[in-house]
Design a protein with these regions (language model features):
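Motif-centric detector for short Cys/His coordination patterns
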Residues: 1-123
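Active-site environment of non-heme Fe oxygenases that use a 2-His-1-carboxylate facial triad
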Residues: 99-140, 145-329, 333-369
Length: 369
């Protein structure tokens, strides 16, 4: 281990020799055009260490130069080394205020921040950044004044994100016709859920647009912030929260030519920062539950039911009717959505966006790290 002192704060950290050698950014080790390492990790001796007296500070302590026992010389930016430590990473995540958990009163107070006109979105890159920032913060945004067609809905989404292709297609248009083995393809009540719980990598973002609803009524949509609900469960019952972050809940989708299955917790947390990174809930797609012993079942079901009480409470649910001309875009890893039963003929269109594309856009715009 090497002790490194910060030139301003005088803080001292200890870093592993091999890790330090692995993070050399000289032109022999790092391709500055592709931003990729250039060497085989096995090229570094396992017992790598600085030569005796082989390190010194340059440029008033801002640069650390190390002469290694394999003959390599590395110059390190001291701020760079300090910024890469796990404690710094955890601290930055803990202090992050990018996301605003919401219930009904909070989201209604902030609705003006999450509505965007299609013409403004097309005309201004600054509006695109505001749109993605709002989606990161609240998990839901609206694009207004979109002509009611699948083609125009696709254009509105592709202005910012590429569209994800699944067995539903890229853009999907649906009614109550049973085109797929899914409750969404019906007129019945559809409770709060996330899509694709049966995929190994569920869509990160979903978009929906009601193209028409004639000769009937009902069909109000509703949205629930799963992040708020999870934090509320953690406050009320930390043990129940812990159970839902650990128990693997199986999901399954079966129709002719398709059989998808995946198991994961209902609340997924980052193992390093403990930050909530994905909410996963779909009572319709739950498969046979065989991932924990029977002796633990009741404790899980009690936790599950307590969580559902929060999710289904009136204060958590934002209910409204989608009309032609408004596209709702929401974070499928955070926000639950559902629909009340309806009569008549209702036509919806929509699509998915991969999580990695969503986050890539946010990084390119400088919104997240």
């Amino acid at each position: 281990m090497m002790e490194i002192k910060h030139y301003e704060s005088q803080e001292i950290i200890k870093v592993n020799y091999f890790w330090l050698r692995d993070h050399c950014r000289c032109l022999l080790c790092y391709n500055t055009e592709t931003l990729q390492r250039k060497y085989n990790l096995l090229d570094i001796p396992r017992d790598i260490a600085p030569e005796k007296g082989g390190f010194k500070y340059l440029k008033d302590g801002k640069v650390l130069q190390v002469k290694w026992t394999d003959g390599h010389i590395s110059d390190y930016d001291v701020d760079f080394i300090f910024s890469l430590q796990v404690e710094k990473f955890q601290s930055n995540k803990a202090k992050s205020t990018l996301k605003t958990p919401w219930n009904l009163p909070i989201v209604l107070q902030n609705e003006r921040h999450i509505r965007f006109k299609l013409t403004d979105l097309i005309a201004s890159d600054a509006v695109v950044k505001d749109y993605v920032s709002a989606l990161i913060r609240y998990g839901i945004v609206f694009i207004d004044e979109v002509p009611a067609s699948t083609a125009m809905t696709e254009m509105a989404i592709r202005r910012v994100f590429p569209v994800m292709k699944t067995f539903f297609g890229e853009m999907f248009t649906f009614t109550d016709a049973a085109d797929h083995a899914d409750t969404a393809y019906s007129k019945v009540y559809l409770g709060s859920h996330t899509d694709n719980t049966y995929f190994c990598d569920a869509a990160g973002v979903q978009a929906l647009h009601c193209l028409s609803h004639v000769d009937g009524d009902g069909g109000d949509n509703f949205f629930v912030d799963g992040l708020h609900c999870a934090l509320e469960l953690k406050r009320r019952n930390p043990k129940a929260y812990d159970i839902l972050t650990k128990v693997q809940v199986p999901a399954e989708y079966i129709e002719k030519g398709q059989h998808h299955t995946h198991s994961a917790p209902m609340i997924r947390v980052d193992p390093v920062t403990q930050e909530i990174i994905q909410m996963r809930l779909n009572v319709y797609d739950r498969a046979v539950f065989n991932t924990i012993p029977q002796s633990e079942m009741m404790e899980f079901y009690n936790s599950f039911c307590e969580f559902l009480e929060i999710v289904q409470s009136p204060e958590s649910q934002w209910r409204f009717k989608l009309h032609p001309g408004t596209v709702v875009v929401f974070d499928n890893w955070r926000v639950y959505h559902g629909r009340y039963a309806y009569t008549g003929k209702r036509t919806m269109t929509g699509c998915y966006v991969q999580r990695t594309d969503y986050q890539s856009k946010a990084r390119v715009l400088g919104i997240i790290d």
